[in-house]
């Protein structure tokens, strides 16, 4: 009798556990009304931003592309557009056009996104490939007070890490530094903006070390690839990559005044060689940039190799009387010229983006 009682008790216990587990699974799989409302709001805000980026007006024929870009189905997008129209954010006709109210809301989102992206670039350890998606998630939730704290910390930046202008608190926009110029062989250019919408192309650009404010020397270009000289090294990229770069032309003298012809990345410095630092790469940002500057890797400092580790990485460098070990992925951001190359007074005085 006791065994029957225990069996019945255990059966009821496990049955209750099973039903509790099933209820938990159902609740986890079904978003709450609050979550559904937040999602609807985010979809609408994403569409406002998309229309704003398109110039404030979008033809109906572009809806298939919008659904692909925003990863939405037709019903979800249609519901979002209807809500925006009812809220006075959008006028609906042959084109979807932002009202003044809708444009203001879109610019506030763009401001939140670009401020947070700049914050990630300067004060986080996240890779550049992660900045955009993290900022995209945060733009819907970051408060105005939080934005202002970031702005104060960052020194009121005008541009985000890719070169896109950040709307001011009054939603005024700094001039976009985008250009439509195509490079020719044996010409010099400054990168004003790097587009990160295409993840594959953006990753290829990052692998070369290119970033906003980088100066390149285009060597050759054809239908498939173009080659260029950058920080003492020669690279090749698919020609379509140029579509993600906005370039400002420079003369040879202007380019060499910033970065002398002999410039190389410090991890190439040999055991018995000495060099003079001319700056840090534009791709070096945030905590690493501040650390290298604090360690004495500033323009004009003399540097030599004290010792290579048995595996070649890290390397100990002597700078300003101190021996400092750096990995290759750190030393590559330090740009130098041979110590025998004193440079002209023009080279000595050039700075801008170096430090």
Predicted segments with their positions:
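Structural motif
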Residues: 214, 301-302, 322
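Short amphipathic alpha-helical interaction segments
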Residues: 71-86
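A short, conserved structural fragment
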Residues: 85-95
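Short, basic, low-complexity termini and linkers enriched in Ser/Thr/Gly/Pro
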Residues: 344-355
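Basic, amphipathic "hinge/linker" alpha-helix immediately C-terminal to the N-terminal HTH DNA-binding motif
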Residues: 95-113
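Short alpha-helical segments that sit at the start of domains
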Residues: 17-48
């Amino acid at each position: 009798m006791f065994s029957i009682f225990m069996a019945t008790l255990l059966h009821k216990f496990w049955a209750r556990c099973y039903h509790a587990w099933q209820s938990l699974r159902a609740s986890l799989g079904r978003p709450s009304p609050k979550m559904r409302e937040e999602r609807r709001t985010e979809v609408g805000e994403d569409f406002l931003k998309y229309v704003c980026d398109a110039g404030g007006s979008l033809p109906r024929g572009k809806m298939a592309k919008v659904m692909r870009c925003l990863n939405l189905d037709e019903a979800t997008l249609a519901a979002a557009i209807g809500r925006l129209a009812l809220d006075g954010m959008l006028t609906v006709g042959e084109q979807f056009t932002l009202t003044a109210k809708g444009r203001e809301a879109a610019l506030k989102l763009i401001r939140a996104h670009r401020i947070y992206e700049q914050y990630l670039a300067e004060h986080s350890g996240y890779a550049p490939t992660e900045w955009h998606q993290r900022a995209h998630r945060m733009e819907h939730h970051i408060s105005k007070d939080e934005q202002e704290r970031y702005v104060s910390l960052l020194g009121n930046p005008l541009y985000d890490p890719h070169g896109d202008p950040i709307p001011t608190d009054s939603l005024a926009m700094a001039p976009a530094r985008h250009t439509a110029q195509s490079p020719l062989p044996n010409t010099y250019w400054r990168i004003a903006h790097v587009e990160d919408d295409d993840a594959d192309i953006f990753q290829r650009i990052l692998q070369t070390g290119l970033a906003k404010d980088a100066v390149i020397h285009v060597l050759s270009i054809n239908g498939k690839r173009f080659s260029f000289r950058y920080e003492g090294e020669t690279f090749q990229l698919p020609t379509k990559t140029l579509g993600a770069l906005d370039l400002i032309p420079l003369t040879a003298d202007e380019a060499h005044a910033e970065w002398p012809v002999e410039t190389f990345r410090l991890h190439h410095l040999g055991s018995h060689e000495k060099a003079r630092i001319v700056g840090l790469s534009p791709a070096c940002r945030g905590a690493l940039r501040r650390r290298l500057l604090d360690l004495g890797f500033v323009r004009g400092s003399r540097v030599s190799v004290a010792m290579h580790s048995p595996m070649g990485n890290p390397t100990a460098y002597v700078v300003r009387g101190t021996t400092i070990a750096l990995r290759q992925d750190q030393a590559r951001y330090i740009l130098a010229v041979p110590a025998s190359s004193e440079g002209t007074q023009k080279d000595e005085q050039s700075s801008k983006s170096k430090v």
